[in-house]
Design a protein with these regions (language model features):
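Conserved donor NDP-sugar-binding/catalytic core segment of glycosyltransferases
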Residues: 129, 133-165, 223, 383-429
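Glycine-rich, basic loop-to-helix element that forms the pyrophosphate-binding segment
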Residues: 105-116, 354-371
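C-terminal, non-catalytic tails of nucleotide-sugar-dependent glycosyltransferases
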Residues: 2-71, 249-290, 414, 426-453, ...
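A conserved hydrophobic helix/loop-capping motif in glycosyltransferases and polysaccharide synthases
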Residues: 72-82, 93, 294-305, 309, ...
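Short, acidic, metal-binding catalytic loop of nucleotide-sugar glycosyltransferases
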Residues: 64-69, 86-98, 144, 311-321
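A recurrent flexible, glycine/aromatic-enriched loop bordering the glycosyltransferase active site
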Residues: 164-193, 361-362, 369, 417, ...
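Short aromatic/hydrophobic "clamp" motif used to bind/position activated sugar donors
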Residues: 121, 376
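A short, conserved alpha-helix in the catalytic core of glycosyltransferases
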Residues: 194, 204-231, 259, 390-394, ...
């Protein structure tokens, strides 16, 4: 019965995905009719196995759609050289391509395109078919971003019956995610000059060779010059590669070596390792001596939770040095007060009394001047340490000069996922993604198990350098006393030019809102509504277009599922990151 139900659910999902594609195709036809510029001189495709029937079929469809002849640079395998001259759509002077060869392993793509007159090259993996509308979308993207360094697009899987399934809707540029997994695995558009500038690499693994190429092409590029085309422009053939992308595949030695070489080229003091849950884990080196971390823990009564939190920090944390600043917000239970007095015998712990009406932002702000540390850790009193090296992991990331805030992986008491990053726009403002997953569930594209950037993380456990906190003027205690203060802070950190990183390798339990509870009174509901509205007014542009998400993905679901509304969120008639009317 369970298998039947799962099959029915998958069938319904595939049907909704194809209905969604049909809605997008209606707009695409309209967009073609309204196109005012010709794409022909901007269309170059490079495929590493053009004899693959799906690839060949897609190329033939593409030629049929052109309004005038185009040049084509094809990067192919040695074994397909002879068959290229037999492709019927290449016959005749107007459609004669330049073709070049590249070995599937250990070869140099730069050498393969050296003789090409084309400045723009689209790289298409051998197990992919090209969407017929891809040249048009590439041309439009180039017109919008003429100084691009690299472009990439969404992808899906083509079934034998002509249907489509398993959409891979990518997020915006995410440097930390690319260090964890080669998430840009479909159609990639690059400049010929950039390919020619690459040094030849002797890498025996196809997947590692591709990952190395992506890292080299992006590691010196400005973020604004790495462009995501939020449309499905390629279709994977075969389930193996799709399965790898839908979850976090285990990295082999060649892939780990590729990431390590990238870190070395970028002078990043870190070591790459194969992560037990999949992908690559990068351990960032700590400065010597390690900086003092100041843990700020607001609390009120709730002795059991506070004792559990403090005990887990003291008994399990392997990092040193650290201090704990407990902010007592008016505790009046005798057992709690006695416990607070006992804690002061530990030289690492200080108690700060602050009896003002509860204002999470103000309590943390007021505690910062009391901290001696270079690193600030905002820690709820209802968390419990799981991984002993949680602070090593988070401090290592927080001390990176381009990182402004770091979040942890948090689990509910029942061992389901509570926090794996915050996605903007869901529910109107934001929501935790991948909630309620079990430990063995990797999440969409494996992202519940991979270090990556988000626009925001929760302050239930968040680290940042003190200088960054002071630069952005801390929490906004006037506008966001209780709700959204951590999201607002992270967005100001992002606006200041820093990255916000979430790591799955620092794990804690979070017995969520166990001390204060949910918003139940009329006064609490009114306060929440006011803070909700302030977030919408201050950050509406960001809330509607989170770069850690995909503009085709649903704003209703917490699992990265694509939009199944009557019309897709992404528009072809206006800039991609504007919603359709």
């Amino acid at each position: 019965m369970q298998n039947t139900r799962n099959a029915d659910e998958r069938g319904g999902l595939v049907a909704r995905f194809n209905a969604w594609l049909h809605a997008l195709n209606r707009r695409r036809l309209l967009r073609r009719r309204q196109a005012k510029h010709r794409a022909a001189e901007r269309q170059w495709i490079a495929a590493d196995d053009p004899s693959n029937p799906p690839v060949a079929h897609a190329l033939q469809e593409r030629f049929a759609a052109l309004q005038q002849p185009a040049m084509l640079s094809v990067v192919m395998r040695e074994s397909t050289r002879a068959t290229a001259s037999e492709w019927p759509w290449f016959r005749g002077p107007a459609l004669t391509p330049n073709w070049h060869m590249v070995s599937p392993s250990g070869g140099s793509i730069a050498e393969a395109v050296r003789a090409s007159p084309s400045e723009i090259i689209a790289l298409l993996p051998a197990d992919c078919g090209l969407a017929p509308h891809a040249p048009m979308m590439i041309a439009e993207a180039v017109a919008r971003s003429p100084h691009f360094a690299l472009m990439y697009a969404d992808e899906d899987c083509a079934a034998g019956n002509g249907g489509r399934h398993s959409p891979l809707l990518h997020c915006g540029w995410n440097a930390e995610l690319l260090r964890s997994t080669p998430y840009l695995a479909g159609l990639v558009v690059v400049r010929r000059s950039a390919l020619l500038a690459l040094e030849q690499q002797a890498i025996e693994s196809d997947s590692a060779l591709w990952w190395d190429l992506l890292l080299r092409l992006t590691e010196r590029a400005a973020e604004k010059d790495i462009v995501h085309i939020p449309h499905v422009l390629s279709h994977r053939i075969g389930a193996e590669r799709v399965s790898r992308q839908l979850s976090a595949a285990h990295a082999d030695a060649a892939e780990v070596a590729v990431v390590q070489a990238h870190l070395d080229r970028c002078a990043v003091p870190a070591r790459a390792h194969a992560a037990s849950t999949g992908g690559v884990r990068v351990r960032y080196s700590l400065p010597s001596p390690a900086p003092l971390a100041s843990l700020i823990v607001p609390t009120r009564n709730g002795l059991h939770l506070l004792r559990q939190c403090v005990h887990s920090i003291i008994e399990r944390t392997t990092y040193a040095p650290y201090e704990i600043i407990i902010v007592d917000n008016g505790s009046d239970e005798p057992d709690t007060l006695r416990y607070l007095d006992e804690l002061q015998s530990d030289a690492r712990i200080r108690i700060h009394r602050d009896g003002r009406p509860f204002n999470f932002a103000a309590l943390n702000n007021a505690a910062v001047p009391l901290c001696r540390g270079q690193v600030l850790a905002f820690v709820n009193n209802d968390v419990e340490v799981i991984t002993p090296d949680w602070l090593e992991e988070m401090v290592g990331l927080a001390m990176r000069p381009d990182v402004g805030a770091v979040g942890a992986r948090l689990w509910f008491s029942n061992k389901t996922l509570q926090h794996a990053g915050v996605i903007l726009g869901i529910g109107g403002v934001a929501a935790h993604i991948h909630q309620r997953l079990s430990r063995d569930q990797p999440g969409y594209q494996g992202r519940a198990q991979l270090t990556q950037e988000f626009s925001a993380v929760t302050a239930a456990c968040m680290l940042m350098r003190r200088e960054v906190f002071e630069q952005v003027h801390g929490f906004d205690e006037a506008a966001f006393a209780v709700d959204f203060n951590d999201i607002d802070l992270c967005l100001r950190v992002r606006a200041a030019g820093y990255r916000v990183v979430w790591t799955p390798h620092a794990e804690l339990f979070h017995h969520e809102s166990a001390t204060r509870g949910a918003n139940r009174s009329n006064e609490q509901k009114a306060r929440h509504a006011a803070e909700f509205q302030r977030m919408r007014e201050r950050w509406s542009r960001w809330l509607d277009n989170d770069p850690a998400y995909n503009p085709n993905a649903s704003l209703k679901n917490l699992d990265f599922s694509f939009s199944i509304a009557t019309e897709p969120r992404v528009s072809l008639l206006k800039p991609w990151f504007e919603q359709s009317p």
